[in-house]
């Protein structure tokens, strides 16, 4: 490492068969680390590999290793980074800003991500490593009430327009300010951008239309921190 290179924080990353990061929660942690000015040392892990790392302590990702300190869960990681490195750019400038990020996440997940999950759950299955596919099918079909993945995604093209319309409050907010954090991106932006990065990692039926106003924010967000969200393995978000 050169004398001027930023110190890195290790991030255990959930990946597809092609090595592309899939988890929106890992993406949140990745953005949080970069926002604090640290380099990300990503360690790729498959679904079935999670229990094989770190002595089997964790059953889900992200996990960071910051000089021997292990932190699990994207919100806990953000809080840890702000608490441990208060001299670096904050993820939550105030308690109120954190509360608003929680509010946004509580709206965005059931309104946008959960419906998109039902559109892309079969894509998720098809793009994971071969050894992960049985687990993905069994766990997702159980979560979805026993429905076959093929049946869940059927008719998704007809459902996508309603999901796009449900994003309208996000478009309205971003028409008045460059970021959800105002003049600078904050954790709410990372929650939203990470959802679109998840969709870009697996979709075979793009969620957005080419003229969607959200692309101004999405593209600027993907370009942050030296193009953190730019990965040639990602799939288009619009046809």
Question: Residue spans of the language-model regions?
Answer:
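GST-like domain detector, emphasizing the conserved glutathione-binding G-site
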Residues: 1-134
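Acidic carboxylate-rich catalytic motifs and surrounding loops in phosphoryl-/glycosyl-chemistry enzymes
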Residues: 44-49, 185, 234-236
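Non-transmembrane alpha-helical segments in soluble domains
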Residues: 78, 82, 102-105, 160, ...
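GST-like fold's C-terminal all-alpha helical module
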Residues: 110-216
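Long, positively charged, glycine-interspersed low-complexity recognition regions
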Residues: 199-239
